[in-house]
Amino acid sequence: MFYKFIYLLGRNLRNPSIKKQLLFLKDSEKWSLEKLEKYQLQKLQELVSFSYSHSSYYKNKFDAINVNPSDIKGLKDLNKLPILTKSDVLTHTNNIHVNYPFKKTFKAATSGSTGNSLTFHRDEYADSFNRATVSHGYSWYNINPWDKNGYFWGFNFSFVEKLKTILLDKLQHRFRIFGYQDKEFTNFVKKLQSAKYIHGYSSMIYQTAKLINQKKLPKPTNLKIVKGTSEKIFEKYNEETRKAFGLKIVSEYGATESGIIAFECPEGNMHINMEGVLVEEINNEILVTNLQMKSFPIIRYQLGDYIKLASRDKHCSCGRNHLIIEEVTGRIGNNVYGKENVYPSLYFYYIFKNLDKNNQIQLNYQVIQEKKGELIFKIDRTILAIEKDLLISEINKYFGLDVDFSIIDNSVIKSEGKKLKSFISAIHE
């Protein structure tokens, strides 16, 4: 009861809109496809009109191609609007933001998976809707957000930030893995015994399951869901998690800019969050429109992932009529291999985020691993001696002596395949 009280108190103070949205999602999950698409059209028309009136970026873009908000009469008219690229978002961040006095906004930042991090303001209504969508997905598995849970996500090694993280985790009945070293890992596995769900980066969940199986550690028996997000879930991941947890990894697909795009139901189908987003598939690539966020409009956003949509005729035995994503093919999560230990690739995000946050040093980067225990950091500009020293300090903070590395500035950062990746590994295990 304590954790429920703390959760509801914090939720209602931070996100006053969320209760109403949870009730709405409970009702709308029973809607027909036709009713869902009628709602989507209404929200799209509102979004386009609002963006045209309050965002200089969208007004200029629409005027340049002679498109007026009144031209959007059906969902098919979405293709009249220009595509928004990641480059557009990073270059025109200020102009995309709307000039409107929202009562409450939150600062949001992307993970910088392409080597560049975006920071923008998300209005309270959109933030609440996104959180409501996650809670609603958990309800399909009889999970409450305040249930004890293991978290495979980010953390920061600075003393103050680590204390803050531990405190917030305690209040949210949450614990997280801070490393794969024996003592820390064993303590984490002990806590898993009483957890109701675990969630986070799929590659970290896989690594944990693999170690539990290899070390023949006690297997959790109370878990109701293992949820992976932000990375592609390979079948070999599920082979290990079924052995370790008795469950496959359930997929939650989304992005900071778009909000939750899809959530996998207990029948194994990834239903699109049609109340929150519009999804298009163009040449197997996803374009997403965030229907709920007005503070920083995201319309026809080229997310950079490759997907396969199911036929509109496909019906799920769970009874929901929301359209289905058959597969997300573009998100691949890799581990970093030291001489002795294995690390999550999100360490790179924190290394460069810390440089920006603490020293105002912004670097466009790509990290290459061809051999275990060795990393190549490629930077696309000249870096000063003091910047290099600070970068070395951050790298050592996360990897210590377990990794040898070189830093090459003025590098040409290349894409691997069609999608630019901030970490490329030649090691596959």
For each predicted feature, which ranges?
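Nucleotide 5′-phosphate-binding alpha/beta core
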Residues: 1-109, 115-148, 155, 197-199, ...
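AMP-binding/adenylate-forming
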Residues: 128, 132, 136, 148-204
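Short, hinge-like loop/turn segments at secondary-structure boundaries
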Residues: 167-168, 216-218, 267-271
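Short, structured coil segments at secondary-structure junctions
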Residues: 170, 222, 244-248
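General small-molecule cofactor/ligand-binding pocket signal
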Residues: 175-178, 250-252, 404-409
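Adenylate-forming
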Residues: 179-183, 195-236, 251-256
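AMP-binding/adenylate-forming catalytic core of the ANL superfamily
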Residues: 198, 301-399
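Conserved AMP-binding/adenylate-forming
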Residues: 233-314
